[in-house]
Amino acid sequence: MAEKAAEKAEQRAADEAEKRPVEDGEKHSGRKRRRRNYDEHDEAVAKDDAQSAKAGAAADSDADDSDADDEKLEVLMAREEEDEDDLAEIDASNIISGGRRTRGKVIDYKQTAEELAAEGAAAGVDDDAEDADADFDGEG
């Protein structure tokens, strides 16, 4: 137990040696410390606010001028957009009159439907249904 006490004492001595030594002037200056008085600072801030309020009134008139300029610019931009629109008449040769668009091919939809029905009847059973069932049977 005496050894533990000796180790603790050595540790304390080492810790204090690592600390910065306290100078006499820092320890006790002989004066009482007081909190800083911010009243003077508050008065200066109040004066600055009053001056900025006066300058702000002048800045507001500048802001009104810039708003008017922005509105004029928007009107001009709208006029330019209207001028850019090409409102030419639609050429009648570009209108497709006969049903669906087929890229120049003429397709008989009734005949195509009949051919698809014939192919479906010839195949008999739907192959997709069998493939879907095979996936769940544990194959694959």
From Swiss-Prot:
Signal peptide: none annotated. Residues 61-72, 125-140 have a biased composition (Acidic residues). Residues 1-73, 118-140 are annotated as: Disordered. Pfam families: CHZ (PF09649). Residues 1-28, 37-51 have a biased composition (Basic and acidic residues). The keyword Plastid does not apply. One of its GO terms (cellular component) is nucleus. The keyword Nucleus applies. It is found in: Nucleus. One of its GO terms (biological process) is chromatin remodeling. GO terms for molecular function: histone binding. Keywords: Chaperone, Nucleus. Belongs to the CHZ1 family. Forms a chaperone-bound H2A.Z-H2B complex that acts as a source for SWR1 complex-dependent H2A to H2A.Z histone replacement in chromatin. Forms a heterotrimer with H2A.Z-H2B, stabilizing the association of the histone dimer. Also, with a lower affinity, forms a heterotrimer with H2A-H2B. This is Histone H2A.Z-specific chaperone CHZ1.
